[in-house]
Amino acid sequence: MRDNTIGSLIWLRLIRFTNQSNQMSNEFLKRFDLTTAQFDVLLQIRTYQPLTQMELAEKVTVTQGGISRMLTRLEKEGYIVRKQDWKTKTISLTEQGEAALERALPEQLAFQSSFFDDVLNEEEQKILYELMTKVHKHSEKKELPQE
């Protein structure tokens, strides 16, 4: 590990935190019969509805194939509806999907916040958020190095 820069150590720590957080969230969300990915998809649909499958795929951390399978399952469970408007198929929440999200949302947000609230004060959280936003914006423009 001596050869690693602080940047690579931060990257590894973020990956480990993300994996641990996702595992714990998946376990936590079982009480609502949802996975972390499904929760994210329902939240994005509610926020931006109606939206297309491609628009949704850009907003979540699920592959295009994965999103298609997930939407089929969410539709079977009655959480979403897909409507064909001329050439465009849009996705919206049903009342049942809205109710499922409303049951899970406050508790999931509190659970996720606890990862930070338990160890960082408000000022530290603001600084971390600003730094992560800065890194995220840079990563969106980043290009792969030449071979």
From Swiss-Prot:
InterPro entries: ArsR-like_HTH (IPR011991), HTH_MarR-typ (IPR000835), WH-like_DNA-bd_sf (IPR036388), WH_DNA-bd_sf (IPR036390). One of its GO terms (molecular function) is DNA-binding transcription factor activity. Residues 53-76 bind DNA. It comes from the Bacteria. This is Uncharacterized HTH-type transcriptional regulator BALH_1720. Gene3D superfamilies: Winged helix-like DNA-binding domain superfamily/Winged helix DNA-binding domain. Keywords: DNA-binding, Transcription, Transcription regulation. It comes from Bacillus thuringiensis (strain Al Hakam). Residues 1-137 form the HTH marR-type domain. SUPFAM superfamilies: Winged helix' DNA-binding domain. Pfam families: MarR. Disulfide bonds: none annotated.
